[in-house]
């Protein structure tokens, strides 16, 4: 359970759910890029970033903690938890001994250690296990000195372990990434032969399953979450006294712009993961089945705690929105450059950048550009999918609006996943010069301060705003089935990306604590619509008929 994916007000209830199912330890990832969004500025206190409080509640609820601090964690999180600003260095090598990477890591670990050190087990705290990196055997660089350096850095900061690595359960994943004296985690460990192999690769250390999957990740355009029965694996672990970690026991939501990607497949905003506890914190049938199974291993006369009360949900009648503005009516001051610059060079993580230039008179040919992100092309203000540009007797305005939807979170391709236009843009053989770039990072203060404007004719990228009144607050799922693609904010809180045009997620989870009695404000940005559509609140997530079987990849 990752605190950044769960409303802070619900942390205790989620811990109680874990204990009531029969678990004695909770693992969680620390997302570096959430705590150091801007280089050198750390935040370990705001809302869902207060891991000191999270650890304290775990202790109060009688649970141990398996800490997974990275620096890389994957977890279908933007850039695997690494800060986007690392990519401002053009040739940086991530996850290795490159000093341009290790120096920021050292600074981050120093700040993180101040928070977690008092909670270490040898200081009377709940942190029972600390992970070194994550699935490094799947990374082609395999800098063993880097792994040892991470372990030694923790020791230097007063964190003495115990330590563990986590890798796939095959020899090629484990080769060259084990550390003497450091336990081995398998992602996942599913049979005795895999555990025996791990012991052979690093004799004398404990082995556990660090990621046993009751579900699997999902991308936009794929099927809805599909549960996987792991009762057979639980029997194996319990009968043979093997430690295990359910990934995920409770997934929650990847709020804001934190969802990652695998290649050109973007991760969903929902991180339900078909876990025993669903996105909203409600126990599923699998939860009760696993609870019964684990309870059967208790000594005579002992029982599990009662399952805590569920968090209530509510429906909200149709909310009327109006067209408030649009990206084109909110253009900021441009940045000028001979050639287009990527998002990171412009000091931006995600959101949009509008690139504008002029095609000289008489120039024709196919428009070609290297880009990372989803582009919409405008010629003289008219959207087009035709890349064949005809010659004109006067210069032509070309605009390319690029949306970034999460950096790659797995494998070495993440090193080159800078967003926006990369390098030169050509029409035929002519390189286009002298670019204006308008940056839209879409931060909450920008959304809450939007001025109402008249619409720009024919321009997509509408910003729609509405209000709704509540007498009581509860969790809800805001239904965006009538919209296409964009971002949703409620009371200034970014609930994440919506992409109903692709599915399978059509409703975004809105926690009750983020609502208020009286007037609430909703803002929807949609890249494809020019007219507002109503939004409703549902008491459950939507699913589709399309489901996919769970399988491990990578």
Where are these regions (language model features)?
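A cross-kingdom feature marking solvent-exposed beta-strand/loop segments within repeated
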Residues: 274, 278-286, 341-345, 373-395, ...
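Aromatic- and acidic-residue-enriched segments that line the glycan-binding/catalytic groove
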Residues: 40-46, 60, 71-95, 147, ...
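Catalytic-core region of carbohydrate-active enzymes that cleave or remodel glycosidic bonds
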Residues: 63, 156-157, 187-278, 282-285, ...
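An active-site-proximal structural segment forming one wall of the substrate-binding cleft
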Residues: 47-67, 90-127
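Aromatic-lined substrate-binding rim segments of carbohydrate-active enzymes
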Residues: 10-78, 151-156
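Active-site neighborhood of glycoside hydrolase catalytic domains
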Residues: 100-179
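Aromatic-lined ligand-binding clefts that engage carbohydrates, nucleic acids, or primary amines
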Residues: 364-378, 398, 468-491, 498-499, ...
């Amino acid at each position: 359970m990752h605190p950044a994916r769960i409303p802070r007000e619900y942390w205790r209830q989620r811990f109680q759910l874990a204990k009531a199912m029969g678990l004695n330890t909770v693992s969680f990832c620390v997302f570096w890029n959430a705590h150091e969004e801007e280089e050198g500025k750390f935040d370990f206190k705001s809302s869902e970033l207060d891991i000191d409080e999270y650890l304290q509640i775990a202790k109060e609820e009688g649970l141990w903690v398996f800490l997974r601090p990275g620096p890389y964690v994957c977890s279908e999180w933007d850039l695997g938890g690494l800060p986007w600003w690392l990519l401002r260095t053009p040739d940086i090598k991530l996850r290795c001994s490159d000093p341009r990477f290790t120096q920021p890591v050292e600074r981050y670990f120093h700040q993180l250690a101040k928070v977690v050190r008092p909670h270490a087990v040898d200081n009377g705290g709940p942190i029972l296990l600390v992970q070194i990196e994550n699935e490094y055997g799947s990374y082609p660089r395999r800098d063993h000195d880097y792994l040892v350096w991470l372990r030694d850095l923790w020791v230097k900061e007063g964190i003495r372990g115990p330590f563990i690595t986590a890798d796939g359960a095959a020899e090629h994943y484990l080769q060259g990434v084990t550390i003497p004296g450091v336990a081995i985690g398998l992602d996942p460990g599913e049979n005795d032969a895999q555990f025996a192999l791990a012991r052979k690769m690093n004799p004398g250390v404990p082995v556990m399953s660090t990621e046993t999957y009751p579900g699997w990740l999902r991308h936009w355009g794929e099927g809805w979450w599909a549960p996987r029965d792991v009762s057979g694996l639980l029997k194996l672990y319990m009968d043979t006294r093997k430690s295990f970690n359910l990934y995920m026991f409770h997934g929650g939501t990847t709020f804001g712009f934190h969802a990652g990607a695998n290649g050109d497949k973007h991760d969903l905003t929902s991180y339900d993961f078909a876990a025993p506890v669903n996105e909203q914190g409600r126990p599923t049938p699998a939860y009760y089945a696993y609870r019964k199974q684990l309870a059967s291993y208790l000594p005579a006369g002992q029982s599990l705690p009662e399952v805590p009360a569920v968090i209530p949900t509510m429906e909200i009648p149709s909310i009327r929105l109006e067209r408030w503005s649009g990206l084109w009516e909110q253009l900021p001051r441009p940045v000028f450059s001979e050639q287009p610059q990527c998002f990171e060079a412009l000091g931006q993580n995600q959101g949009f950048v509008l690139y504008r230039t002029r095609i000289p008179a008489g120039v024709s040919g196919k428009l070609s550009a290297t880009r990372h992100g989803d582009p919409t092309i405008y010629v003289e203000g008219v959207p087009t999918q035709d890349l064949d540009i005809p010659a004109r007797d006067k210069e032509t305005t070309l605009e390319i609006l690029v949306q970034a939807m999460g950096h790659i979170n797995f494998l070495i391709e993440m090193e080159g996943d800078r967003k926006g236009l990369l390098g030169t843009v050509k029409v035929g053989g002519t390189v286009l010069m002298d670019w204006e770039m308008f940056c839209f990072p879409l931060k909450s203060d920008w959304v809450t301060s939007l001025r109402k404007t008249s619409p720009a004719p024919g321009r997509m990228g509408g910003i729609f705003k509405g209000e709704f009144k509540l007498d009581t607050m509860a969790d809800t799922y805001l239904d965006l089935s009538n919209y296409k693609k964009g971002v949703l904010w409620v009371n200034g809180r970014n609930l994440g990306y919506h992409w109903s045009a692709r599915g399978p997620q059509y409703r975004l989870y809105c926690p009750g604590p983020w609502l208020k009695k009286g007037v609430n404000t909703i803002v929807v940005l949609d890249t494809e619509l020019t007219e507002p559509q109503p939004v409703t609140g549902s008491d459950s997530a939507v699913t589709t008929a399309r489901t996919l079987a769970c399988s491990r990849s990578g």
